[in-house]
From Swiss-Prot:
Catalytic activity annotation: urea + 2 H2O + H(+) = hydrogencarbonate + 2 NH4(+)
Lineage: superkingdom: Bacteria
Keywords on record: Cytoplasm, Hydrolase
Gene Ontology molecular function, alphabetical: nickel cation binding; urease activity
GO BP field: urea catabolic process
Pathway: Nitrogen metabolism; urea degradation; CO(2) and NH(3) from urea (urease route): step 1/1
Protein name as catalogued: Urease subunit gamma
SUPFAM superfamilies, per database record: Urease, gamma-subunit (SSF54111)
Source organism: Paracoccus denitrificans (strain Pd 1222)
Similarity annotation: Belongs to the urease gamma subunit family.
Keyword Cytoplasm recorded: yes
Subunit annotation: Heterotrimer of UreA (gamma), UreB (beta) and UreC (alpha) subunits. Three heterotrimers associate to form the active enzyme.
GO CC annotations on file: cytoplasm
Amino acid sequence: MNLTPREREKLLVSLAAMVARNRLSRGVRLNHPEAIALITDFVVEGARDGRSVADLMQAGAHVITAGQCMSGVPEMIEAVQVEATFPDGTKLVTVHHPIRHEA
């Protein structure tokens, strides 16, 4: 199987997101790379499903909460930028303050 560098990167993010989901299901708090991977995968898959950029920017901030992350991780991530492929082309999606404290 021959994959382009972009396809390899997407596959790696997807795998990291699977690991993060598995850890969350066991009650393990996420570290920085796992949190980024989970949010990134959410945006990439949402774009593939046909969701809008605005919708993903908004919904991406509710994928995980501060309580699901290791101490200090939410403060480390001010924004996550994802280049995702939408039905009408590739677009940059920015999720500001993606890990919020529970209300």
